[in-house]
Amino acid sequence: IVEWRKTGKPGLVGIVTGTIAGLATITPASGSVGPLGAIIIGASAGLVCYYACSIVKEAMGIDDSLDVAAVHGVGGVLGTLMVAFIGVEGTFGGLGLSVKNTLDDGTEVIYTSGEQFVVQAQGCLAAIALSVVATYLIVKIISPFLGGIRVSEEEETKGLDQSGHGENGYTLN
C-alpha cells in the first residue's frame, strides 16, 4: 500500500516485500498478540520497513540484496518492541496495562509496558550484538576460501538484486 501511494501503482515486489515484512514483524509477537494486535503490527511493518529500505538504499548508499536488513532486521526489532505495548493482557503488558505475576516464592511482581519495553529493547540489542559478532567471525573464516566477499565492480554497478538473483528489487526515486 505504501509503494502504491508513493508510485501510483502497486508492484509485485512491493506486495511480496510487504508480506515478508509483515511476517518478519509479527514473528516475535506471534504468541503474545491477538488478531487486532497482529493487524496493527502488520500495518506498521509495511510502513516502517518500506522507509527502512529507502534509508538503507538512498541515504546510506548500501545495496542490501533483497533488502534483508531493512525488512527482516528492522521488522524483527519493530515486532519485538511492539509486544510491550500491544501484547494481550496477561503476557507482556498489553495495551499499556500492568501485568501481575506471582513468582514461585509467592511474591507478586507488577510489570508495566514501559518496563517491558526496556526488557524487549535489551533483548534486541543482545540479538543484534550476537548477529554482528557471529557474522564477522563467519566472514573471516570463509573469506579466504572464497577469495573475499566483494562482488565485481560490474556486478556492483548492475546491482546485487539483478546480478545475484536476476530480479530487480525496489527502484526508489
Name each model-derived stretch.
Residues 1-173:
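Glycine- and aromatic-enriched membrane alpha-helices
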